[in-house]
Amino acid sequence: VDNPLLAFGLIKRLRSDWLNVVYSEAASENTRELQAGFEALRQELPGLEDLEGAARALMRLQDVYALSVKGLAKGVFEPAGARSPLYRPGQPVTLSADDCFHVGKVAYDVGDYYHSIAWLEEAVDLFRLSYGSWNTEDLASLEDALDHLAFSYFMAGNVSHALSLSREFLRYDPSNLRVAKNVAQYEKLLEEQGTAELGPPRRPDGTRLQTRDAYEELCQRPGTQHPTPSLRCSYETNGSPYLLLQPAKRETVRLRPYVALYHDFVSDAEAETVKALAGPWLQRSVVASGEKQQKAEYRISKSAWLKDTADPAVAALERRIAAVTGLDVRAPYAEYLQVVNYGLGGHYEPHFDHATSGKSPLYRMKSGNRIATVMIYLSSVEAGGSTAFIYANFSVPVVKVRGDPRQAPWPTSGSTSTGRSFGSHVAPGPRTEAAPGSNSAARLQIQGK
């Protein structure tokens, strides 16, 4: 599913909405058959973790691309204040009030009031428009949205807004003693403290806050390279007999630092073969943390590793990489081919591909630190998905299907270089990735001593 909103809606419908329908009074006449059929499929349906992950993915897209929540609810991926959308799906998918409430509730449950306020505001607006009508699939109501939004504003320091929303709640449910008590407390606080309010809630600080702004700015304006007459396209053999009859198609993207894209590096059939081989083995990607490896919110993807013996297509791909780069990619000089799937809102925030600590698990391999990375796109995305080089201050957009090993000299990039030699002093710089849709890539890390 290319559209993240459609993916979220589908996961929510399968995980949450169906439960409400199957166990509703309207289904009582066919309860046994309906519930039996549902239970038979339940193990294959998305779980709560999937639904919450889809909601967090929408919030991640909201942040990285500065998207308007109101625009997202209308099915348009539009940066706040922009004149044109970043991405307009061929068939727009709108979000319901209940959808927006659920996204806001996921943020609310972890104390993230920056995101909960934006999504619950939209939920309240949409519930107000449809108040009085009832949708079988809705789990939430206007009262629920008002209640959660009021407390979000209170926790963010806006007591007067919390009071206003709580009073509105009581107009719909005047017998609710808890909310009535909240109103009394809010009124007392305003009497004691006055009407001075804190500013708007601040976005939660990430683990990579110092580079986050640069990363997101580059993702929002991908491929902004200044025209340079010296940049050109060429056919390259790199002195390899393997490339004599079918030279590599190289596009020089940047000279300082040097970055090139190789077009048509893999065929569609090869890409599908690699994805099919990796599919059954995909697991949540991990990052190095001291001597251990662990999951991290700044890397959201699934990955699998393929040996060159897995299929002739993998062996052929590695021979091609060796021919283009001039580097030995056989073990132990390179790791196995890593296939990565960036699903809904998948991304990898600023990071180094090489080890920065002597305790890294990489050193236990006794093959040296990483000196180069070849990255090949196996599929394309509808929008976004750029690779951003934050210290060099530029980004490279996804090349539609086929492949694009990247190359650059150090220390400005973490990707592979052609026709250059490296020593142990090599220090690749961080690279970042963010993808709003489903995207698969193959990566080959090369070691040096």
Sequence positions of predicted segments:
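Fe(II)/2-oxoglutarate oxygenase catalytic core
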Residues: V1-G403, P409-K449
